[in-house]
Every structure is written in C-alpha cells, then in structure tokens.
Amino acid sequence: LVKAVKAAAKAVKSPHAETVRKAAAAPMLEVPEPKLTWMNKSRQWGVRVKPGKKGLTLGSLNVGIYGEIPMDWPDQTRNPRGAIGRKGMPPVGYMLRSKSEVWADSAADLYEEAIQRRWVPATDVPWNTVKPLPDDLERAVCQVNTELSQYANVEIEVISAWQHQMVYGYHEVKQYLATAGFDAARHYEVFRKRALINGGGLGLEGPGQVNRMILESRGGWTEAVVYLVLVRGLLTQTILRYLERYASNEAESFIYRNVLQDKARLMTYGLDHLKFAIAHNEDQQQIVATLLAIGDGLFIRDFNDPVLREALAIIFGGSIAGARGAGMDVYHDMMRAYIRTHLEYCQWLDVPRRVPERLKQYAPQD
C-alpha cells in the first residue's frame, strides 16, 4: 500500500500531469465555424466506377472527365488529372508536356500486369538447383550475367531520369515506368546473384558504347526509347531467349524466363509509344530512322568486341571446344533472329531502315 501511494504521488508530480493541469486551467480557445467551401469544388461529382473481371483497374478509372487525356498538358504542377488546380502554385518545370512525347495506349494495362506478376530473386529463384559447372562454362555464364547486369543498371538510370520529367496528366505512363524501373533493379540484382552463387564472380565490364548512347540521349524521351527498345532492348530480349534454351539448371531457366516476361512489357510500351509518336508528329518517322542510322556505328563497336560473343558461344556449345562449332552456329542464328525482328519492328513502325554493312550477313536474304 505504501508503494502504491508513493507511485501515485510521483505520477501527480510528473511533467505530463503538470501539462494537463495547465491546459485545464487555461481559457477555452474559440473554435472557428467551419466554412466547408471546399465541399462544392469538383469538376465532376457522382462518379461510380464498378470493378470489372480484373478488379478496379487503373484504366477503368478513365470515365467522364477523368478519362479526358488531352494532347497537351500545360499544367506544370503535381495536380492529379481531373482535380481542380490551386491558383498561384509555382510550376515544377516538367520537360515532357505533350502526349506524343510519352504516351502509349497500353501503359495502364502494362502497369496492372507488372504489379500482379512480381517475383522475388531472393526466394522465388530455385537457387538450390545451381550445381558446380566446368570452369570454362561457369566463367562464360558469369561474364554474360555481368554484362546483363550492366544493361539493367543503364535501364534504371535512363527510366528514372526521364520519368520525373513527365507531367502528371499522363499518370498511366508515369506509373508504368515506375514498375519498369523496379523491374530493371530486380534484373540487376538477379544477374549479379547468378554470377556470385556458384564459385565464380563478376567478369569484365562491357565496352559500353551503346550504354553511353542511351544514357546521353538528350533529344527527348522518344529518342531514348528508340535506343532503349529498338536497339538494346531487342538485343537483350533475343539473348535471354537463347540463354533460356541453353540454361544449365532450373535457376537459370527461371531467371531468364521471368526477366523475359518483364522485358516484354517494356518492349510493348516502347513500340506502342513510338507508333503513337510517329502518328502524331510528321517528322518523327524520319527522326527515328536518323537516330537508328547514328546508333549503328556505336552498336557495331560493341558488336566487334569479342568478349560477349565468345562467352555466349561457350554457353551455347557447352564448352570452349563446343563454342568453335555448334556454339558459334547458335550465336549466328541468334543474331539473325535479332536483325530479322528489328527489321520487322521498323516495318511495323513504317520507319525506313538499311542494315549496316557489318551486319548484312545476318539480314534476311530476299
């Protein structure tokens, strides 16, 4: 009982108790009458969006005035599309304010797919299936994964650098590209993990000419997409398809298959965006053709470096000895697939294209 009394006395003397006493003794503050003028501020009230078979998706919200997506978005604040802007807000200074500079009709659906098909390299990849490989094969796998991780890092930088330059009026694109940046981070992670899990390590840095071309694109997001998708993205996608066929274990097969799934979304967005940009800008078709012609020189410099070519041939042939015959045959088949698909995409975009002399050996024969 004595202890309880002492504890109560101590509580009464505590700083908190003193604060409560002072607040109780202070005069009552006058609470202003709420004006509630904001309650009648809405561009369209009474909207009821019903979830469809896939739930309440991002695209399903585009109803009424909330589905109005103009070709130009002059508002340079962070005001959500459909909301009433506040007067006097300082501009943020977005560089990309035209729909033709960023838009792709598939962006909302790609966002939904991206958030539904997430995978975790730490726990989803069956790492226990990775077994010791012959030294030459392990070195080749590590070298290829080193260069693929470098490609992924470039994607992170490029996507993040341009995404924050886009106005909020085209939020579907901003939201999808947020997932694409996260995909690239996951790819960077998983390729490094494959290089480091099996007694090997990271290999040699790639020549990086195409990397710099993508990173230093300053003409706009569309220019960056030309290099990110039509050049680097398609090549990476083609390499991954062949790597999945020649995977040494289930872990590698899982990695390449799931990265391909993520990559397909970026390719879809990029091609849709280029199609939209060309349709709404009379000069864009020739601009894309010029950009590709400029990029050919840098692509060939990377192509002439033997490191990636030899590493892929070893994987396809199963060894250094196998690389000299079957491995190089598969590599050449892979390059033919890349050039063929590249030309098909250019034809779909109505972009005139000439295969550079160095790569004509892989071009389809008429």
PLM regions and their residue ranges:
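Short amphipathic alpha-helical segments with heptad-repeat character
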Residues: 146-149, 153, 178-181, 185, ...
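Long, hydrophobic, well-ordered secondary-structure blocks that form the structural core
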Residues: 156-217
